[in-house]
Amino acid sequence: MTDPIADSVAPDLLDEPRLVVEPGVAARFGAVAEPVLLAMGYRLVRIKVSAEAGCTVQIMAERPDGTMLIEDCEAVSKALSPVLDVTDPIEKAYRLEISSPGIDRPLVRRSDFARYSGHLVKIEMAVPHQGRKRYRGLLDGVEGDAIRIQREGVKDEDPLVLLPMHDIGDARLVLTDELIAESMRRGKQAERELKQSLGLAPPPPPHAKRSDPKKSNAPKPKPKPPVKAAAKPKPTNTKQHRLAAGRSRRGDTDLSEGD
């Protein structure tokens, strides 16, 4: 499985450039890895070279919809390893690690900021903006070449700030319950589509509708209180009623009743 999705991906999604590009050794790995990923239908997210286990090269990749399954990581590793062995971007031995972006993922493209609007983010600017380098708040979409952030706990100033995308040094999502729920939903959908493409799961019937996440995540209406049953009519043929009727016919007076 070396080319799982390339034929079904829109070219403009694959070719969208990253806003942040790594320098040095990581850039050399990126120059080799990115063409291979694009040919397979994946996008490069980030490359990190660390001293872990001697030397570890972590290549973070994703599908254009933001998902990345274990099978995807295995396919990328199988295709990329021999290419890196030939080009040899680094002289010493290293351990190659292919991974997904994760739930609290970095945001590296314009489409990332649009896709995760409404979620909590933390931003570190490469160039200070309004005298600050660090921002945290709700991502409120994209406006021109800037992102909108609704800052938390701001007093005596406008909580809304526009941050130029090309001045951002690092941006990532903050782990929340809402983000975890959305990530699980995306992962399950991607897994179903992969199994269907491999013939491991039957396709949905033609009349089946795909679930709308906005509707499924909407609060459910409160149940209406149960309707009280109508009161039973009082009996009119009891012994008391029959005695009263007899007295009425005889002209007797009911001494138990008041005036």
UniProtKB/Swiss-Prot annotation:
Record keywords, A-Z: Cytoplasm, Ribosome biogenesis
Chain segments carrying region Disordered: 186-259
Highest taxon, organism lineage: Bacteria
Record-linked InterPro entries: Ribosome_maturation_RimP (IPR003728), RimP_C (IPR028998), RimP_C_sf (IPR036847), RimP_N (IPR028989), RimP_N_sf (IPR035956)
HAMAP family assigned: RimP
Location in the cell: Cytoplasm
Compositionally biased residues, Basic and acidic residues: 186-195
Disulfide cross-links: none
Biological function: Required for maturation of 30S ribosomal subunits.
Keyword Cell inner membrane: no
SUPFAM superfamilies: YhbC-like, C-terminal domain, YhbC-like, N-terminal domain
Feature: compositional bias, Basic residues: 239-248
Location, primary (coarse class): cytoplasm
Name the UniProt record assigns to this protein: Ribosome maturation factor RimP
GO cellular component: cytosol
Gene: rimP
An individual GO BP term: ribosomal small subunit assembly
Family to which this protein belongs: Belongs to the RimP family.
Organism: Rhodopseudomonas palustris (strain HaA2)
